[in-house]
Amino acid sequence: MDPVEEVLNNPATRAYIHRLIGDEGINLLERFPKDGEHSDEDLAASTGINLNSVRHTLYTLYEKRLAEYHRIKNNETGWLTYLWQLRIDLLYDAIREDMETVLSKLERRARFEEENDFYICKDCHDIYTFTVAMGGNFTCPNCGQPLSHFENETLAKALRARIEIMKKTLGHA
């Protein structure tokens, strides 16, 4: 089976790709010629997809290292032509990199939740750290109502559970 077809037939990897490049990008991948390198103009012409959409998709894939190009300069005009090829074989590396980024953000958020006390306005539902609440004499800066202690243990536990699942998935001990 073709690597692109294999990726697009898997619901999880298809969803990841779709989040990156949308419907038109998926359409381009489905129609991308199997072999060789192709200019963005040739891809637009052969697939019937708008040139700007083709370029946007290719640049987005390039940012994740899922497409690569090399340039050829026309010596007469000085114009550059970019010849593209897909690197779908690097998809799992891109997913792993994104998961590592999310894991790092979740860990920072969990630390923030665990290291702070929070107060909530029962009317506005805005939440403030202890420092901010104390600075406003435990009254809501928006509506003047008194702030109540907000128990964030459920959120902190949920973050820690998600972090553990991601660590196991990524092979972290």
Curated annotation (Swiss-Prot):
Keyword entries, A-Z: DNA-binding, Transcription, Transcription regulation
This protein's record includes keyword Transcription: yes
InterPro entries per UniProt: TF_E_archaea, TFE, TFIIE/TFIIEa_HTH, TFIIE_asu, TFIIEa/SarR/Rpc3_HTH_dom, WH-like_DNA-bd_sf, WH_DNA-bd_sf
Top-level taxon of the source organism: Archaea
Family: Belongs to the TFE family.
HAMAP family: TFE_arch (MF_01909)
Protein name as it appears in the record: Transcription factor E
Gene name for this UniProt entry: tfe
